Every structure is written in C-alpha cells, then in structure tokens.
Design a protein with these regions (language model features):
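Alpha-helical recognition/docking segments in bacterial nutrient-uptake
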Residues: 1-3, 62, 66-178, 235-241, ...
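Hydrophobic alpha-helical segments within soluble ligand-binding/sensing domains
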Residues: 163-190, 227-236, 254, 293-313
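An alpha-beta-alpha
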Residues: 174-216, 319-333
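Short beta-strand elements in bilobed, periplasmic/extracellular small-molecule ligand-binding domains
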Residues: 95-109, 187-190, 207-230
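Flexible loop/turn connectors
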Residues: 235-341
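N-terminal helix-turn-helix DNA-binding module of bacterial transcription factors
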Residues: 1-64
Length: 341
C-alpha cells in the first residue's frame, strides 16, 4: 500500500481491531489498551508507511516509549566504546527486552555527563539507563531532569527516582579468589586500570578469599599502546614473581594479558592460569577459553526496564539492587600437580 492511500481503517482491518483503537494509539491515548496491542499497531503503522517517521507522534505523547541509553565514552575505550564486550552484551540484552516490551532504544556515547539532561529532554524520553559513570554526581543530574533513570554500577548516595542496578562485584572477586586457592595457588597477580569503584571491589574480594596466599596488584595503563609497553617492560619481573594465577578486573584485560603471555611462549594454563570477569562472548571464543565470573546481562536488562516502568507509574523501587554473579570454570584454569614456569 502506498503511504498516501493507507487509512486508519486499513490498519484496523489488517489487525482485526477497531479504528478507534488504532486512532488512540496514534494519538498516545493508550491507558486502556494493552501493551501488546499498542506494539502491534505501531509495527503495522511503520510497515505500511502510514506514518513514515514515528518520531513526531512519539515526541508529542506523554509516553514516548523511548528509552535513552548513555555510555561513558571513557578515554580507555579509545573511541570504540560500542565495541567493548561488556557494552555490546548489555546493549544486546537491553535491545531484546525493549523490543519485547514495545520500547525504542536511543543510544548516546559521551564522556561529559552534563550532556545527559539535554539529551533526555530533547527526545521526551520515558527513562534513562546510564553506564560507566561510576562516581558521577547523580543527585545534581537528577535535579536537572524529570526523567527517572537506572544506573549500571553507580557509587552514590540514594536519591529520588534513581535506581543503582549493580552486581556482586566483591562476591565475584571472592569466588575467583576462592577457586584459585582451591586449585592450589599461593601467589597471584591482580590486574586493573584503577583501584576504584567496581574494580576495587573485585580485587578486594579476590584478596580476601585468596588469603593467606599472596596477591600482588598491578595498575596497568588503560590505553593499548601504553599497556603493551608496560607488559613488555615488566615481563621479567612477572616471571620473577612466580605468580601462577592472574585475576583481571575484566575479560578484556584477562584476554589481553593472555595474548601477551602467549607471544612470549608462556603456556596457558600449563605455566600460568588466568581468570577474568564479565563472561563476554570473547571469553568463550578464546584459545584456551577463559575462566571468568558470569554476570547475567539479560536479567539486568529485564530489571532495568521493570524499574523504569515502575518509577514512571509512581511506584517505589529499591534504591540499590544487587544481582548475583557466578564463577564459570573453563580451559584457562585447572588443578595442576606441578608447575614448569
């Protein structure tokens, strides 16, 4: 059907519903219409071309069905934040959940949290999900926007209509440390690009469980070129440490260090064992596959949207929600009777 010939009656007939229902959806009067029906109508409107650009209708509504997702484009990502394994996994899960519930996702990357209120108000969003701004001033941000938002892994005092949706960072580190100790390790090396927020919790958990074993911490450079130089410069020192297991704050750093060691002839897991954190797709595809701490991106996405919906309808949500994590043993670790490093 051509765009200028499509009528509301055509849409209603195709879906087997009344013209009044279609009209109400178009004009945002959906209080008495099920989410499933709203979604069907919106999909049919787009498919037939009745509304070539839904933005005008969405922005005019009280409920735009737009969820903004803002990621901190930190310098460590070197301009490729959307390529990060954790970010990709999170966005994929949010996209699936948003589609299921009839929402539209709008994605923005920025290193400046001050851009967020403008972004949110410009598009009349139903809610926001923020990632990577661990110690930002969320109270100030909240005062600048009427929109409720969910923060992934924030570190801030509780404030109105903001949910801190985090995971068991300390517990994940603890599980990794306990597992390493059970394998018989007594010397470990911990890697992260900072000793703050979630990375600190992960390292603290590892150290607590690994005791009385010795766990040394290296704060590695965030940028790839500098990090590679750091590894090369400290390789001899690493060998002299006789650390038989490495725990990294993320799968990215675990795999990065594993590749470096492999270029130096170090065998994984025969000579050194490695544990990561996040359970990204790359951890399942590496050679050897990476032992890591799994976090459920789908569960977090489902919880995030449920919180936004609840806050929008005036209900109270917990100020902080902590989701569980689970250690996943794979090929980069195993119990060894002897070491040849």
């Amino acid at each position: 059907m051509e765009q200028n010939r499509v009528r509301i009656a055509d849409i209603a007939e195709a879906l087997g519903i009344s013209t009044a229902t279609v009209s109400n959806v178009i004009h945002g009067k959906t209080a008495k219409i099920s989410d499933a029906t709203v979604k069907r109508v919106e999909q049919e409107l787009e498919k037939t071309g009745y509304i070539p650009n839904m933005a005008g209708i969405l922005l005019a509504r009280n409920n735009s069905r737009i969820i903004g997702v803002v990621m901190n484009d930190h310098v460590k990502y070197e301009g490729r934040v959307l390529e990060d394994g954790f970010v990709m996994s999170s966005l994929n899960a949010l996209s699936r959940e948003a589609n299921e519930k009839g929402y539209f996702l709008m994605i923005k990357t920025t290193a400046d949290i001050r851009e967020i209120p403008v972004f949110a108000s410009m598009w009349n969003m139903d809610g926001l999900i923020l990632m990577g701004f661990c110690e930002a001033d969320y109270e100030a941000l909240r005062s600048q926007t009427r929109i409720s938002f969910v923060v992934y892994d924030g570190y801030f005092a509780a404030c109105s209509k903001v949910v801190n949706l985090t995971i068991g960072h300390y517990d994940g580190g603890y599980q990794a440390g306990q597992y390493a100790r059970e394998l018989g390790h007594t010397k470990a090396l911990c890697l992260a690009d900072n000793d703050l927020c979630m990375d600190k919790e992960r390292m603290d958990g590892f150290r607590a469980a690994f005791a009385p074993g010795k766990a040394l911490f290296w704060q590695i450079p965030a940028l790839q070129k500098e990090r590679s130089a750091y590894y090369a410069e400290h390789f001899r020192r690493f060998l002299n440490l006789h650390s038989t297991v490495v725990f990294a704050a993320s799968d990215f750093y675990a795999l990065d260090f594993m590749r470096f060691l492999q270029t130096k002839g170090v065998r994984i897991p025969d000579d050194v064992q490695i544990i990561g954190f996040d359970d990204t797709a790359a951890s399942r595809e590496s050679v050897p596959t990476l032992t890591t701490v799994h976090q459920d991106a789908a569960q977090r996405a489902k919880t995030a949207l449920a919180c936004l919906e609840a806050m929008r309808s005036g209900k109270e949500c917990e100020a902080q929600i902590v989701l569980p994590v689970t250690l996943i043993p794979r090929e980069s670790t195993r119990k060894m009777p002897c070491w040849t490093l």
